[in-house]
Design a protein with these regions (language model features):
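Active-site pre-lysine segment of PLP-dependent enzymes
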Residues: 1-15, 27-50, 57-91, 104
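Conserved core segment of the aminotransferase class I/II
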Residues: 77-147, 151-156, 160
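A short, flexible beta-alpha/helix-coil linker loop
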Residues: 24-27, 134-135
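Short SAM/SAH-binding signature in class I
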Residues: 17-19
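Walker B catalytic acidic pair
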Residues: 23, 55
Length: 168
């Protein structure tokens, strides 16, 4: 699944305030090229929308470059970027994520957050810090193994005569 600009355009109503993008996408492995994202950005800008960009799988792409939506021209101030440590750093279950967004948005989020969450567990915060400081070798090892498995499944499907859209 890849969102097309014309499909987005036709789904926008006067009450639309934001678009949710989830890419790279699990389980399809779909990701979006810079050109495709720029076309989405044009629609977003034309309709004065925000984008909630769930990029939790940003490190788990193969054979293509991941393009982060807020890196596009004029999109940083329109994007609420969601990320986390569970996928790339194998910290599933730790439930430690982050948001990058304009202050107007993060200020409003904090007003709600303070009443529904105490804080992330201290151990998870220290683990995430350690992952950022010293975990890249482990990430690369996991990515290599995941890619080996991905290639095995792709080859097996093709050997059996099955068509497929290669996951990235």
């Amino acid at each position: 699944f890849r969102l097309l600009p014309n499909a987005l355009e036709s789904a926008i109503t006067p009450s639309t305030k934001a678009v949710l993008l989830g890419y790279p996408a699990n389980p399809t492995g779909a990701t979006m090229s810079r050109a495709a994202l720029e076309a989405i950005a044009d629609v977003v800008e034309r309709h004065d929308l925000f984008v909630i960009s769930d990029e939790i799988y940003d490190r788990l792409v193969y054979g293509v470059e991941h393009v982060s939506f807020p890196s596009l021209p004029r999109m940083k101030e329109r994007t609420i970027l969601l990320g986390g440590f569970s996928k790339a750093y194998a910290m599933t279950g730790w439930r430690l994520g982050y948001v990058c967004a304009p202050p107007l948005i993060t200020d409003a989020m904090m007003r709600v957050h303070q009443y529904i969450m105490m804080s992330a567990p201290t151990a998870a915060q220290y683990a995430a810090l350690e992952a950022l400081r010293n975990g890249e070798e482990d990430v690369q090892g996991m990515l290599g193994e995941y890619n080996r498995r991905r290639q095995l499944v792709i080859k097996s499907c093709l050997d059996m005569g099955l068509g497929l859209n290669e996951p990235h």
